[in-house]
Amino acid sequence: MKQIINPLKGNNNKVPIWFMRQAGRYLPEYKKVRETTKNFLDFCYDVSKATEVTLQPIKRYGFDAAIIFSDILVLPHALGWEVDFKENIGPILKQFKSQEDFKYLQINPNYKLEKVYEIIKKVKKELPSPISLIGFAGSPWTVMSYMLEGKGKQDFKTSKKFIYENRILAEELLNFITEKTADHLINQAKSGADILKLFDSWSGVLAEEEFTEFVIEPTKKIILKVKEVFPKTPIIAFPKGAGLLYEKFIKEVPIDVLAVDQMVPLKKMKEWSDKVIVQGNLDPVVLLTNKEIIKEKTYKILQVMKGKNFIFNLGHGILPETPTENVEFLIEYVRLYEEKNSNSTF
């Protein structure tokens, strides 16, 4: 049985481990391949190169899962929306402002998404059988907020003002993205993804009413639509920064796995693991420190989550400046803990 699936099947003696952004800029072998293609989106659609970098962290570290190398913005890009990535700036998008802007969105995605599915098929063929393959998409609110802001990592005043003042239009855009996201995930599962993940990076900026309408409801719709076709495919949801609303999310969304950020108390993770598989939540900055600190912080998580339904991961993506030897040490430490499975320190 695939290692990462074990907790989902009631076998929680193992501690599956993988990292968000495990294929990325902290790896020298990734940088070498990335330098061969100037445009980031072209790199995401390059079947050979995206396959290679997806497999790099598996070959180097032996993670229990590979996550396909792609980006949450390939979906709007494939639907005809203007998306570009500027070096040292990040994503720049055409800004969605009015009903007129729907004319720039296509009903059916173009050939670009087929490249993503080809990458999944190719990785699947090359991936060792015990390793799970994770496909993913951005959750509708996060993708929508990029389109409304025209860029990422803002204070989201533009997005929130838009949904307050243009509720009907905002719901129309949300529903469109929700439908296309579900289709994208279904196609990834058809192509060979064992597990699917929804990244809602900006869910934490919303108040409860908007969180319910723009995070909980579309996530439910997506999961129910995917499960109609692939009822046994586990789905991970990551409503990052949800805070107290994580509990509402767990109660109302039929997820298999809840990914949590580093701000969530371990006591809450343990409590929630009786209801759902919990994934997380080491602070990525810990991996910038030293082995003693890494061991201390990791041990605390492992001890609290011992015997629970748990997948070890970070609270967010691995940072580009992370030393590769620290990643190796952390993985070895988790494996050693798993072997000993005792309360002793080591």
From Swiss-Prot:
It is an enzyme of class 4 (lyase). Substrate binds at R21, Q22, A23, G24, R25, D71, Y146, S201, H316. The record marks D71 as: Transition state stabilizer. Gene3D superfamilies: 3.20.20.210. Its EC number is 4.1.1.37. Keywords: Cytoplasm, Decarboxylase, Lyase, Porphyrin biosynthesis. One of its GO terms (molecular function) is uroporphyrinogen decarboxylase activity. It catalyses: uroporphyrinogen III + 4 H(+) = coproporphyrinogen III + 4 CO2. Homodimer. HAMAP family: URO_D (MF_00218). This is Uroporphyrinogen decarboxylase. It comes from Rickettsia africae (strain ESF-5). The gene is hemE.
